[in-house]
Design a protein with these regions (language model features):
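Short intrinsically disordered coil segments
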Residues: 10, 42-43, 155-160
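Structured beta-strand-rich core segments of catalytic domains in phosphoester-bond hydrolases
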Residues: 1-33
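His/acidic metal-ligating clusters that form di-metal
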Residues: 17, 24, 50-85
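Metal-dependent phosphoester-hydrolase catalytic domains
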Residues: 68-79, 86-167
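Active-site-proximal beta-strand elements of phosphoester/diester hydrolases
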Residues: 22-48, 81
Length: 167
């Protein structure tokens, strides 16, 4: 019916106990293409940024099925991390996109509908940290406030490995 959603590259939710505290870990890898999943005309779909729209649907589904199932999640330890394949509005001083660009849909959803905090942005406001060779930040770590208060530092590590593999 067109309303169904599939998380093409996968997502997972694990609960682990550390020091007597339960931590919810959500990992993900969203759709990487400019065109929508199963688009018949990939070029046209890409021009319409339908890949961004599809990723936003994946993100809503992931959040609805994980943190969205727990009424008091904002007071618990939650972390969501992975390859979001999407840029964030907080980095738009680097990208220079129009404010209504669909590229922001994924992170706009997270910031507007969940208690998650982008920890790299929070710890390094205004200090852009790319996560890809092409100069974009598409890999993110989000946390709820209680878990974030335990963080001492966070940054993108550039150790040479990414130069040998593809973004």
């Amino acid at each position: 019916n067109g309303d169904d959603i599939i998380v093409v590259h996968g997502a997972g939710w694990a609960q682990v106990e550390v020091g007597g505290k339960e931590i919810n870990l959500v990992t993900l890898h969203t759709w990487p293409q400019r065109y929508a999943y199963k688009a018949e005309n990939q070029a046209e779909s890409g021009k319409k940024q339908e890949g961004d729209v599809f990723r936003a649907k994946e993100m809503k589904y992931i959040c609805d099925q994980t943190i969205g199932t727990v009424p008091d999640a904002a007071s618990q330890y939650w972390m969501m991390l992975g390859d979001f394949n999407a840029v964030s509005r907080v980095d738009n001083s680097i990208y220079g996109f129009d404010e209504d660009n669909k590229a922001f849909l994924v992170h706009d959803y997270v910031s507007g509908n969940t208690p998650y905090i982008d920890i790299v942005d929070r710890l390094h406001p205004g200090d852009f940290q790319k996560s890809t060779l092409s100069g974009r930040r598409i890999d993110f770590i989000y946390m709820t406030e209680p878990l974030f208060r335990k963080v001492r530092s966070a940054e993108i590590i550039h150790d040479g490995y990414p130069t040998s593999c593809r973004d």
